[in-house]
Each structure stands twice: as structure tokens, then as C-alpha cells.
Amino acid sequence: MSQIVDIKAREVLDSRGNPTVEADVILADGSVGSACAPSGASTGSREALELRDGDKSRYLGKGVLKAVAAVNGPIRDALIGKDALAQAEIDHIMIDLDGTENKSTFGANAILAVSLAVAKAAAISKKVPLYAHIADINGTPGVYSMPVPMMNIINGGEHADNNVDIQEFMIQPVGAPNFREALRYGAEIFHALKKVLSDRGLSTAVGDEGGFAPDLSSNAEALAVIKEAVAAAGYELGKDITLAMDCAASEFYDKEANIYDLKGEGKKFTSEEFNFFLQDLTKQYPIVSIEDGLDESDWDGFAHQTKLMGDKIQLVGDDLFVTNTKILQRGIDNGIANSILIKFNQIGSLTETLAAIKMAKDAGFTAVISHRSGETEDATIADLAVGTAAGQIKTGSLCRSDRVAKYNQLLRIEEQLGGKAPYKGRSEIKGQA
């Protein structure tokens, strides 16, 4: 009864008002799974291709009718009659039919929407929650944990129209006893930060991921105002709350000059100098995780960064690894970073995403489940984080319903699972156990 009898796709809007693909997968027993593909702003050059129409007369060229047509045509034809419980088989049928390394025939946005909708339909057919079905197909049935959130409360870089070069300044409520309380810690600090910024006469407008996006004198000032907000909310920095950053350094790397150019504060660095700049920040503040601290192609620089800080803090590869097992394996073999950011649409299917998480864990890396800056109300990443016991999730700030949808789903899951999904706090972060 879990055979696929129909697949439908449509163009819907993401949180930036750009089109994306939503797919419905209908099974013989009447189960229907629906899923939307997210979209990134600061993207790695090796990511799977997000297929856009390029027709400037519609949505400024960002329409996805070609990807929708791929779902409603060849993908649907290939999957009718297949068993939705056979996730890997279905994903590989789509990958093989596409026939390209980067999914450029159908688009990763088309393949991913169907892949996730299949998983949702299968879970409904089995009458189990999505996180339980994900754990089953991951080969880890019944093994769950609640993730420590990385809450992006100050936005810069490609996620905001301000002068802050580093893209994300995040808090992690590592001292909370459970996820529900972690969310409360974060929300209270978010509101305290709004008052701190307002009292300084700074903007409290928010960026793509719901964090505040003020103009600041330096990137370090972002950490200073967060420190003030943590104290104002009644929490202890370094004990209750730790800090994390996503530099998205590829966005301010000058490839021709081989320089990291922090235009917002008028500073330029070589690769090694920028590593020491970051290390200095970790000595001033309890920063326990740095993501994409260098350009995605600066592997020598990443080797230096890992030697410099990799035994003390979590060094996360996002643009560096793009959820791709081939690239991740190279990083593992060469001692590059110690953690991977996991984004469904960088690789384009649930099966390949699970493979990347497994490879990371087997190598002693951590895996941080992540949203994209262009999101929808789809909360699948919440179930992915719990169902793979990944331990950490990055899904934005404490406002914008496209972000809060994931937090609310995690609240529901924690309530359902009770003590079966522990919240382990600091020990989930590489170098902090």
C-alpha cells in the first residue's frame, strides 16, 4: 500500500519572496507527503545546481517552472509504482535519470522536494513520526537526541544590508537542561539584545534569518553587544551560553589578491593572519564553533586553522564541504576542519544527506543540521536532527515564522519523546566534551 500512485509539483514562494519547488507524493493507501526545497544566498561553488528558469519576465528570472516540469514529467513517470519505503532506491532512480554530477538536468530543487516528500509520505503510511522513519532508514531505529540550537541573533554578510562582514553571530544555550529551556534562554537573550541595540540607537531591523542587522564599528562589536544582552537576560556567558560564528569567508575573500577583506572595518588579512584574528576573538569571548573561517578553496589555510584551533573548538565546513561525501572524505584524509554543516539542498537528496552525516560521525566529526537563508514553513530539518541524533541544529533567530517553524517542531518532538531524546548541551560540540 506504500506504492507511489501520483506526484505533483508546483511553484511556491520562499521566505525571500523567490519561487521554489513544492512536491506532493501520493501513495496507494492515500498517504500524502509534501515538501519544499530551500534556497541559499551565500552558496558554495560545488553545491548541486538549483535550477532557475532565467526568464526575466517572470520573478526576475528566478522562476522554477523547469524544475516543476521535471517533477511532473520524467521524475513522476519514473517513480509511479515504486515503494515509498525504498528511499535509497527512489533517490538513486532520480539521480541516475538526471545523469549529471551536480543534478543540473532536473535541478537539485526538483529532486530534493520529491525525495523529502517521499520520506514524509512513507512515514504517514507507516503511521510513525517523520523523525522515527528517518532513524529507520538511517539504520539507527529508536536512537534520538534533541539538538543544541545555534541561534543566529546578529546577521551580516550576504544575509543583511549592513556593514558587518561576518555573516552570523550565534548563541548556543549549552547550559539548558532540555530543548524547551534552551529555546527559552535564546528567546530571552534575543529580546534583551533588541533593547541593548535600541538603547545604543542602533537598528533593530532583522536580516534574512531573523537576526538583528545593525551597522557596527567592527565585527568584534557584534560579540560585545551579545555579551551585554546575555548578562542583561540573566545568563552567564561561557557557562549557560556559548558563542558561535559563521564567517562565510568566501564572500569577502579577494581571489586575485589572495586577501580576506573586512571592508566594514577596513582591515585586510592573509590566510594565516585571518586565522590568528579568529583565534584572538576566541580568547576574548567563549566562541566554541567557527564555520567557514576561510574561503572554500583555501585548503592550505584550513589546514593551518585546524592545527591552530581544531583541538579546542569546532571548525565547521559549509561551503568547504557542501554536504558532499567526496569532498568531506578529502577533508577527513587531510586533517581539514572537524565538523560538517549539513544542508539538504547542497547535495539534493535525503539518501546522500544521510550518507554525509554517517561519514562525518564515523570519522569523529560532528554534523550540524542547517536551514538555508531562503526557507519555507517546511520543518523537515527538525526531524532530521532528531532522527539522526546529530546533536546540533542551525535554524536562525527567534523571529520569522520560517525559522520558528523548526523550533516549534522540535518542541513537539521533545514532548512526544519525553526522556527518549536527551539534550546533551556542551558535549555535543566538538572540542567541548
From Swiss-Prot:
Its cofactor is Mg(2+). PROSITE patterns: ENOLASE (PS00164). InterPro entries: Enolase, Enolase-like_C_sf, Enolase-like_N, Enolase_C, Enolase_CS, Enolase_N. It is an enzyme of class 4 (lyase). One of its GO terms (cellular component) is cell surface. Component of the RNA degradosome, a multiprotein complex involved in RNA processing and mRNA degradation. Its EC number is 4.2.1.11. It comes from Marinomonas sp. (strain MWYL1). This is Enolase. Mg(2+) binds at residues 246, 291, 318. Catalyzes the reversible conversion of 2-phosphoglycerate (2-PG) into phosphoenolpyruvate (PEP). It is essential for the degradation of carbohydrates via glycolysis. NCBIfam families: eno. HAMAP family: Enolase. Belongs to the enolase family. The gene is eno. Transmembrane segments: none annotated. Pathway: Carbohydrate degradation; glycolysis; pyruvate from D-glyceraldehyde 3-phosphate: step 4/5. It holds the Pfam family Enolase_N.
